[in-house]
Amino acid sequence: LGDVYKRQMLMCLLHDVVEIDAGDTYAYDEKGKETQKAREEAAKERIYGLLPEDQKECFQQLFEEFEARETAESKFAHAMDNLQPLLLNDSNNGGDWKAHRVTAEQVYGRQSQTKDGSEVLFEWTDAVIQKNIAAGNIQKES
């Protein structure tokens, strides 16, 4: 793999490690999102604080780049990060979407930044969303 792909994979992994430690927040849990940033910041400091200083700085920089979504690499990494739960819901007939009464507006809101990372991936994502709306797995309206 090229350096760009390695960097993107590291961004996703480093972000996920922090989410695991902080307690992942369900994508459509507005109440959980209120404390998400603080929990993730504390987890990041705790986990990366265990590392030698040079690794800590490198990993924190990659984490911050991922969070900022300003570089092409971080935008694509975010698109990939958003893809996993979409694929999971698609493969289980919208199990979580149905259980939480998720609307098309919510799913499109979450996936809106996918286009910034990859137009092709967004087109595919849109087709998956439309298929799940038609199947009744995602509510058309709230």
Question: What are these model-predicted stretches?
Answer:
Residues D29-R46, E73-K75, W97-D116:
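Divalent-cation-assisted or electrostatically stabilized phosphate/pyrophosphate-binding catalytic cores
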Residues L1-Y5:
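Short, small-residue-biased leader/transition segments that mark boundaries at the very start
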Residues R69, A99, Q106, W124-A127, ...:
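Long, compositionally biased intrinsically disordered regulatory segments in eukaryotic proteins
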Residues G117-S142:
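Charged phosphate-binding loop/patch that engages nucleotide di/tri-phosphates or the phosphate backbone
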Residues E53-G94, E105-R110:
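Histidine/acidic-rich helix-loop-helix segments that form or flank divalent-metal centers
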Residues M11, D16, L50-E53, A79:
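Conserved catalytic core of Hanks-type protein kinase domains
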Residues G23-A27, L87-D90:
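Short, function-defining helix-loop hinge/capping sites that tune catalysis or transport
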Residues R7-T25:
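Active-site alpha-helical segments that house and flank conserved acidic catalytic motifs
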